[in-house]
Structure formats: structure tokens, C-alpha cells
Amino acid sequence: MTTTVGIAVREGVVLATDKRVTAGYYIAHKQGEKIWKIDDHVAATMSGGVADLQSVLSFLTLRAREYKMEYKRPIPIRALVNYVSLILFYSRPYIYIVHSIIGGVDDEEGAVLYMADWLGTVTKERYIATGSGSPYAKGALEVGYREDMSLEDAVDLAIKAVKAAIRNDPGSGEGIDVVVITKREGFRRVFTAQQKIVLAE
């Protein structure tokens, strides 16, 4: 149970998650980090079984490093997404319980966002939410998303979406993490006033 959100705009990609980690109906951790840095230009959110996610995302991180060493350039995000799709598809019938948003910026596609589920299905998205709080977050995204929105507006919308989930979903809570990925600055964590308000509620 969790909420993760991704938004792609012209300037870059925004990933946002809540911080609550649950085991069934038990709150196991209140400061969980659910955004995994794969490389400077790409990251993924974590929704599903923690051990499975850590395993799969470790594979992706290793693949990104191998690619960079071999070809002297960052791995294209589509290649990384194809790789995770194969891992998830060929793990059947012993599937990884993984639902992840993979987003970043590369030379081939610019700012791009993909969703991968535990069966290996991959879809390209402009905005997406996963986890138990996703119905609430997706509603906020559908109302607020615009194709021409700025990166700053996308950060605000991502926070609103996760906040909507925190207010309505018992599996989401404790605060919000936000990461922005741009071509110029790469991967960076963002902290905003809205997050402080969420933490105080």
C-alpha cells in the first residue's frame, strides 16, 4: 500500500511518493524512500513488494552501469524499460510483485515516463499514479495536468496528487518525497513548503 506519481513535461520529469511503509494493516516504517535513483538521468518509483522491488531495481541499476561502461554514454530509457519488461515477463509463474514508474530524460526521447507492472506490461505515459492511493492521485492528475505546464507547476501538481491520496488512503501517509530529473541538472531531490504542511498535518 502506497502512492507513487509521475509527470512528464517538456523540461523534465517529476516523481513523487508518500513515505509510509506498510505490512498489511501495520505501519512498518514512517520514513520510507520509494524513489530509486538508477542513474543521473533516470529513476523509478517503488510500489509493491519491497524485496522484489529492491531486487529488480538493483538489476536495472547494474544494467545502466554496464551500458555506460561499454558504450561511454547513458543508457536510453526505452532500452532500460525493455530490460525490466523482460525480467518481469520471464519470471513467470513466480512473479515479482512490482508496479513501478520509470522516468527520466535522454537524447532519444527527451523527458519520458513509463509504467511497468508485475506481468511485464509497459506503457508510455504523460502522467501516471500507482499504489493503493492511485485512484485519488489519478483524479488530481487528470484535473490538473496540461501538456504545456512548467516543471514548477508539475511539482506542485505531483504534491497535490500525493496529498489527495494521503488524505483518503490509509496505506499512504507521513510526508512526501519529490524528485525532479532534467537534462541540465540530472537527478535532484526537491523539498517544498507544501511538503512541510503535509508533514505537520
From Swiss-Prot:
UniProt propeptide residues: 1
Recorded superkingdom: Archaea
Entry annotated with the keyword Protease: yes
Record-listed E.C. numbers: 3.4.25.1
Active-site residues, Swiss-Prot/TrEMBL: 2
GO cellular component, one term: proteasome core complex, beta-subunit complex
Pfam families documented for this protein: Proteasome
Signal peptide start and end residues: none
Coiled-coil segments: none
Database matches in PROSITE patterns: PROTEASOME_BETA_1, PROTEASOME_BETA_2
Enzymatic reactions: Cleavage of peptide bonds with very broad specificity
Nucleus keyword on record: no
GO BP terms in the entry: proteasomal protein catabolic process
SUPFAM superfamilies assigned to the protein according to its UniProt record, in alphabetical order: N-terminal nucleophile aminohydrolases (Ntn hydrolases) (SSF56235)
Annotated control of activity: The formation of the proteasomal ATPase PAN-20S proteasome complex, via the docking of the C-termini of PAN into the intersubunit pockets in the alpha-rings, triggers opening of the gate for substrate entry. Interconversion between the open-gate and close-gate conformations leads to a dynamic regulation of the 20S proteasome proteolysis activity.
Locations listed in the record: Cytoplasm
GO molecular function: threonine-type endopeptidase activity
HAMAP family: Proteasome_B_A
Quaternary structure, from the entry: The 20S proteasome core is composed of 14 alpha and 14 beta subunits that assemble into four stacked heptameric rings, resulting in a barrel-shaped structure. The two inner rings, each composed of seven catalytic beta subunits, are sandwiched by two outer rings, each composed of seven alpha subunits. The catalytic chamber with the active sites is on the inside of the barrel. Has a gated structure, the ends of the cylinder being occluded by the N-termini of the alpha-subunits. Is capped at one or both ends by the proteasome regulatory ATPase, PAN.
Family, similarity comment: Belongs to the peptidase T1B family.
Job description of the protein: Component of the proteasome core, a large protease complex with broad specificity involved in protein degradation.
Name of the protein described by the UniProt record: Proteasome subunit beta 1
Gene coding for it: psmB1
